[in-house]
A protein has these predicted regions:
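Walker B catalytic carboxylates
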Residues: 4
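Conserved helicase motor core of SF1/SF2 NTP-dependent helicases
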Residues: 7-179
């Protein structure tokens, strides 16, 4: 049995997995990618479930991001023991807005500047309510700029079955793994 994204499983879920599948398991994950607000390190409770004879292999080379993004994320998470892949990109921009609508206006501006360069982009929000509000706001603003509807805006929720080109608005938990 292979279990991926171990950081998103709770103690009880691992107990159930062991009970349902009494065999050897390969459990993979990255505690820095948890979907919970607080990081939980499953390695603290896995020995209590599966016994002390656990072989732990730590892979600390990051290949997904540019050095600039990885260093910025590491400052936020406090994780410093990651070997970064030597790939560079633009510096991370941190912007602060008075409200969500001001941030969404900037999203429209940036998207319109770059949309010829990318087939798909995503605006990822924390909650479904925020994502739906953002989608409706963007839809209204984009319709007023382009009444013919050539703006390719999609709202992705739990019921979505298709992934379309353009700008997709969704939540972080639905976007996980789509990168």
């Amino acid at each position: 049995v292979i279990v991926d994204e171990m950081q998103d499983y709770s103690w009880i879920q691992f107990v159930l997995l062991k009970k349902l599948f009494p065999c050897r398991m390969t459990i993979l994950g990255d505690k820095a990618q948890t979907m919970e607000e607080k990081q939980q390190d499953a390695l603290t409770f896995l020995p209590g479930i599966f016994g002390r004879d656990i072989r732990k292999i730590i892979m600390n080379r990051s290949y997904r991001n540019t050095m600039e993004i990885a260093q910025y994320a590491n400052r936020l998470t406090g994780i410093q023991d990651i070997e970064l892949f030597d790939r560079h990109g633009a510096a991370v921009e941190e912007r602060h807005f008075e409200n969500l609508e001001a941030a969404l206006d900037m999203v429209i501006e940036k998207w319109e500047q770059k949309r010829a360069d990318y087939e798909t982009e995503a605006l990822i929000l924390f909650t479904e309510a925020e994502a739906e509000h953002a989608f409706l706001y963007l839809e209204d603003r984009l319709k007023s700029r382009d009444p013919d509807g050539e703006y390719e805006l999609t709202y992705m929720n739990r019921d979505s079955q298709n992934f379309k080109k353009g700008l997709t608005v969704t939540t972080f938990y639905l976007a996980k793994g789509l990168e």
